[in-house]
């Protein structure tokens, strides 16, 4: 299970992700080769599209619907853990839809209900930039969470949507934890202690996620790991387990959200190398199963209720 992949943007831009390609990091055949059976697909609204964010996210949802309709035997949308299990049993990829950047709501809380009806079950408030909901990791404009951001979080929790704190500023992160209850996730964020970067989380933030029964998905982007090598990803997994415990670490590859390649993990088809690396570092099967999906599914079950 991968908590964050951006390939749906490629599909929306008319790249055929139903055929195996050497382009990018992923497509449907390579996801299968890599053993991914649950994929959270990011519906990313770039800041340049913020002025028509709701229209943009609807375009991305339409692109997913076309993909799913044309490939019914291969994948399906999952809005519950029970649906994930049914899709897994059928040998189909379970697709969880997640908005990246709350600018997708166009400043209207009611749009949350609209995207929920379309199958969206997770959302981050910002990307790197600040918006009308909160400050992002790379820009301070509001001093944290805004009143509108609080309204959005309230409605998300009423709907049973998963709150993703990746891309938030530190102040926004703590504000979100103060006004929400239950598990929170950071879908694609690493340990700042190993790789200092505003997009990574410090030890206290990681511990706070663990106290809330949440998870952090380790990001494969070399800028956030400290270098383009599988070993650096394994280092972050090991460190985050040390800080958070083995029940709170997951994977959030960010594949197709960055350029270049990671040695020994060049694309999603090479994910078995990560499993082998965990075995080589002495992790037992139970811990590896948690990292590869068990921890994230536990959070989904607690928030979704089924």
Question: Could you say what each language-model-derived stretch is?
Answer:
Residues 75-78, 161-168:
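Catalytic beta/alpha-barrel core
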Residues 93, 153-161, 281:
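Short, surface-exposed connector motifs at secondary-structure boundaries
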Residues 163, 179, 209-213:
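Short gly/pro-enriched beta-turn/loop segments at secondary-structure junctions
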Residues 129, 168-169:
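A generic "binding-loop/recognition-motif" signal
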Residues 142-159, 176-186, 243, 274:
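Alpha-helix-loop-beta-strand connector modules within alpha/beta enzyme cores
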Residues 1-142, 147, 192, 196-251, ...:
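N-terminal hydrophobic targeting/anchoring segments and the immediately downstream early-domain regions
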Residues 108-112, 172-182:
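Distinct, well-ordered alpha-helical segments
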């Amino acid at each position: 299970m991968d908590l964050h992949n951006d390939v749906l943007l490629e599909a929306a831009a008319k790249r055929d992700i139903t055929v195996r390609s050497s382009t990018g990091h992923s497509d449907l055949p390579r996801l299968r080769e890599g053993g991914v059976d649950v994929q959270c697909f990011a519906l990313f609204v770039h800041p340049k599209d913020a002025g028509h964010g709701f229209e943009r996210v609807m375009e991305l949802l339409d692109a997913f619907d076309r993909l799913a309709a044309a490939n019914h035997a291969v994948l399906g949308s999952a809005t519950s853990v029970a649906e994930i299990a049914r899709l897994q049993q059928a040998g189909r990829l379970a697709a969880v839809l997640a908005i990246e950047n709350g600018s997708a709501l166009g400043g209207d809380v009611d749009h949350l209900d609209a995207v929920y009806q379309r199958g969206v079950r997770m959302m981050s408030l910002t990307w790197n930039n600040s918006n009308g909901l909160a400050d992002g990791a790379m820009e301070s404009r509001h001093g944290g969470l805004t009143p509108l951001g609080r309204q959005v979080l309230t409605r998300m929790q009423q709907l049973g949507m998963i709150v993703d704190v990746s891309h938030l500023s530190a102040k926004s992160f703590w504000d979100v934890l103060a006004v929400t209850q239950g598990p929170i996730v950071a879908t694609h964020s690493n340990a700042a202690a190993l790789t200092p970067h505003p997009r990574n989380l410090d030890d206290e933030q990681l511990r706070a996620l663990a106290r809330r029964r949440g998870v952090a998905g380790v990001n494969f982007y070399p800028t956030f790991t400290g270098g383009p090598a599988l070993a650096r990803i394994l280092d972050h997994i090991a460190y985050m387990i040390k800080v958070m415990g083995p029940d709170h670490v997951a994977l959030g590859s960010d594949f197709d959200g960055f350029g270049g390649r990671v040695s020994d993990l060049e694309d999603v088809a090479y994910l078995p190398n990560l499993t082998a690396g965990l075995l080589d570092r002495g992790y037992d099967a139970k811990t590896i199963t948690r990292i590869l999906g068990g921890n994230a599914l536990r959070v989904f079950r607690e928030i979704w209720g089924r």
